[in-house]
Amino acid sequence: MIGLNHQFLLKNLVSKMKISKDDIKKYLPHRKPFLFIDEVVNIDKNNEIHARKMITSNEYFLEGHFPGNPIFPGVIIIEALGQASGILGFVTMDKTPEEGSIYVLAGVDKVRFRKRVRPGDTIDIYSKVLGEKKGIWKFDCRAELNNELVCSAIILCADRKVT
């Protein structure tokens, strides 16, 4: 099990922090059409982020997933969990991608999908730091729709230098 071995845990934050839509781009190098975090509701001192993704009928991949019965793809939900975890990692370490670092998806464990997500839905995304070891961060993640579990997963992100 990865254990926390640093005293960096949100040292500069008060009990809650909200990140504006523009500031999301300071913490994530992703851009449209591959930016899947629309809002960061809060990041708290317990090392947890609450973010949101609003699903619109304009999502480019819904045309083919599935014609006449659009369902937001599970792999994109996993990506959104990873992006929320990346924001949390950057905030926790008090740095941004501009400083030459990036969080890349290193693994996904224990994935379960429980409910379909469709255009018009808004999913709430939660990620909590479980630990860090040698630059590999472990997060306990879930996505919810109307307070019902949509997806759960353990996400691993690697903190790497941009080359």
Label each residue range with its predicted role.
Residues 38-42, 110, 152:
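Extracellular/lumenal ectodomain signal focusing on beta-strand-rich modules
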Residues 21-31, 98-99:
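Short aromatic-glycine motifs in intrinsically disordered, low-complexity regions
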Residues 34-36, 123, 137:
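Hydrophobic core residues within well-ordered beta-strands of beta-rich domains
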Residues 40, 72-97:
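Active-site helix/loop of acyl-thioester processing domains in fatty-acid/polyketide metabolism
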Residues 32-72:
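Catalytic strand-loop segment that frames the active site of acyl-thioester-processing enzymes
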Residues 25, 68, 113-115:
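Beta-strand-rich interaction surfaces with strong enrichment in secreted/lumenal proteins
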Residues 9, 16-18, 86-124, 150, ...:
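Hydrophobic beta-strand-centered segment that forms part of the acyl-chain substrate-binding groove
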Residues 2-5, 13-16, 29, 45-46, ...:
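HotDog/MaoC-like acyl-thioester-processing domains
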